[in-house]
Amino acid sequence: MSTAKLVKTKSSDLIYTRNDVAEDEKKATIEVLNRLVTELIDLSLITKQAHWNMRGANFIGVHEMLDGFRTAITDHQDTIAERVVQLGGVALGTAQVVNDRTPLKSYPLNIHSVQDHLKALADRYGVVANDMRKAIGEVEDEDTADIFTAASRDLDKFLWFIESNIE
C-alpha cells in the first residue's frame, strides 16, 4: 500500500509536482484545459447521440465516420485531462461539470435524418474547433499548445468531413 500523500503547495490550490512551469502559468493553463475537457466530453456525447439516431441516405457511411470521430475526440479529451493533472490540477469531467459549463447548444433529440444530424453536428463541431484553435494562443506552455494543435487538426478535419456530407 502506498503511503504517498497529495501535498498542495503553500501558495495555491495546485497539487505539488516537480514540473517547473510557473505556478501562475499552470493555473491559467489548467483553466483553459478544463474548459476544453468540458467541450470535448459534450461533443463526444453529442456525436454518439447522432450516431445512434440517424436514418436515411448515406446512413452507414456517416454512422461509421462518427464512430471514428468519437474515438479520436475521446483520445484528445484524455490527453487534455491528463495534462491538467500533470500541471498539478484536478481534471473536471463529471456530467454535472459538463452540464454547467458547456458552451454547446443543447442537442435536439427530435431529429432523425442524416442531413439534420449533420447540420446540428457541424454547428457544434465548429464551436469546439474554433475554441481549440483559439486556446493554442491563450497558453504560454508549449507542451499544452502542442496538445491543442493536434486536437485542432483533427477537429478541423472532422468539421470538413461533416460539412462535405451536407447536401
UniProtKB/Swiss-Prot annotation:
GO CC terms of this entry: cytoplasm
Per the UniProt entry, the Enzyme Commission number(s) are 1.16.-.-
Q: Which InterPro entries match?
A: DPS_DNA-bd, DPS_DNA-bd_CS, Dps_gammaproteobac, Ferritin-like, Ferritin-like_SF, Ferritin_DPS_dom
List the subcellular locations.
Cytoplasm
Listed under catalytic activity are: 2 Fe(2+) + H2O2 + 2 H(+) = 2 Fe(3+) + 2 H2O
- Gene3D superfamilies in the cross-refs: 1.20.1260.10
User: GO MF annotations for this entry?
Assistant: DNA binding; ferric iron binding; oxidoreductase activity, acting on metal ions
Keyword hit for Glycoprotein? no
Residues that hold Fe cation according to the record: H51, D78, E82
Domain of life, per lineage: Bacteria
Q: Which GO terms describe its biological process?
A: chromosome condensation; intracellular iron ion homeostasis
Keywords of this entry: Cytoplasm, DNA condensation, DNA-binding, Iron, Iron storage, Metal-binding, Oxidoreductase
What's its top-level EC category? oxidoreductase
Q: Which HAMAP family match?
A: Dps
Show the NCBIfam families listed in the entry: PRK09448.1 (NF006975)
Q: How does it assemble?
A: Homododecamer. The 12 subunits form a hollow sphere into which the mineral iron core of up to 500 Fe(3+) can be deposited.
Protein's job? During stationary phase, binds the chromosome non-specifically, forming a highly ordered and stable dps-DNA co-crystal within which chromosomal DNA is condensed and protected from diverse damages. It protects DNA from oxidative damage by sequestering intracellular Fe(2+) ion and storing it in the form of Fe(3+) oxyhydroxide mineral, which can be released after reduction. One hydrogen peroxide oxidizes two Fe(2+) ions, which prevents hydroxyl radical production by the Fenton reaction.
Family of the protein in this entry: Belongs to the Dps family.
Protein name per UniProt: DNA protection during starvation protein
